[in-house]
Regions:
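Conserved PLP-enzyme active-site core in the AAT-like
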Residues: 1-166, 185
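Conserved C-terminal alpha-helix-loop-beta "cap" of PLP-dependent enzymes
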Residues: 152-326
Length: 328
């Protein structure tokens, strides 16, 4: 999570910061203390923008965290297609205060957005919001029940483990999205291996696989049958696997380190390039983006120096079976 103390430290160290942008919830469902962060940011007279792409369903039920539009954020971006019944590509930008000029936002939307928007997609957003407005209580009550029943049914797994929101300390997460199912492999296999078994043998597609866990996305549109299929599959897999030697996991902090910028992105892309082996890359400058997908956050950006630790981190991700994009 991002804490108010982290934000305060950065604002003190870099007084020319004009805007603070944070992601909450994260891809894994970790939620930061938006209200306290907003208070910290506003004390410096600047706005807070929250990337709440995975939190479009927040604020509709007491079983879920509040959404950032009600917690002091000045602008909030929600991908309604991720967790609400809307078409892929659809999202909402909320302007919540006058710290961000609406006229300026409209001006840049006119520059960056298409001049031929899809009315099908826009109508899909409206329909999604109508569904929420009409049946919110029923949908979220059923959703919360399904999640609770799933976690209760899978709590006695011997090797695999479905994380409970209570498993996170306040240092790790201010809050947690119960709709994200984090399934740990218990060092019985890699997350990638578990994802493959669930897909190939049970027809269940996970959202993401990491070193020793997978993430399952759920929503108000999931059914009792869908949750039962996943819990039954996990019980079957759990009965056939056992803990092995420790799998060397790698944390997001190790993967997404701050890198030294040697030249701008356009300079790096236009420069003469050559391909080298990863173990020989330390000391070179990246000529392309290197990232794990999902979620697509860059490990390296063109123009950044490649040090020994970063090269080894990329090699370790490959050994774990993670999807590393951007390598030749």
């Amino acid at each position: 999570q991002v804490t108010p103390q982290m934000v305060q430290k950065q604002l003190k160290q870099t007084p020319d910061i004009r805007t603070v942008v944070i992601t909450s919830p994260t891809y894994d469902g970790v939620v930061s203390d938006i209200q306290s962060i907003a208070d910290t940011v506003h004390a410096y007279g600047i706005p807070l923008i929250v990337d709440e792409a995975h939190g479009a369903h927040f604020g509709f039920s007491p079983e879920f965290p509040e959404n950032a539009t009600r917690l002091g954020a000045d602008a909030v971006i929600m991908s309604v297609h991720k967790t609400l019944p809307a078409f892929t590509q659809t999202a909402l930008l909320h302007l919540c205060s006058d710290r961000i000029a609406e006229k300026k936002v409209a001006q840049f939307l006119g520059i960056y957005e298409t001049s031929s928007p899809s009315y099908l997609l826009m109508a899909g957003i409206e329909k999604s919001l109508q569904i929420i407005e009409k049946d919110r209580e029923m949908l979220f009550a059923a959703y919360s029940r399904r999640l609770a029943e799933f976690r209760d049914k899978t709590k006695n797994l011997k090797t695999l483990q479905v994380l409970q929101p209570s498993d996170f300390s306040k240092q790790e997460a201010f809050s947690f999205d119960p709709g994200k199912l984090l399934i740990l492999t218990g060092n019985s296999m890699s997350g990638q291996a578990l994802q493959e078994i669930l897909l190939q043998e049970y027809g269940l597609q996970m959202e993401m696989a990491s070193g020793n866990y997978v993430v399952a996305m759920t929503s108000i549109m999931d059914t009792d049958e869908g949750f039962a299929r996943l819990s039954d599959a996990l019980e079957c897999i759990d009965g056939t696997v056992h803990k092995k030697e420790e799998i060397s996991e790698i944390s997001p902090r190790e993967i997404y380190r701050e890198q030294k910028t040697v030249m701008t992105i356009d300079q790096a892309l236009d420069a003469e390039q050559k391909t080298v082996r990863l173990e020989e890359a330390a000391g070179a400058v990246s000529g392309d983006y290197v990232y794990l997908y999902p979620p697509g956050i860059p490990i390296l950006v063109p123009g950044e120096a490649i040090d020994v630790q970063t090269a080894e981190t990329i090699r370790h991700c490959i050994r774990l079976g993670l999807e590393v994009e951007g390598l030749p």
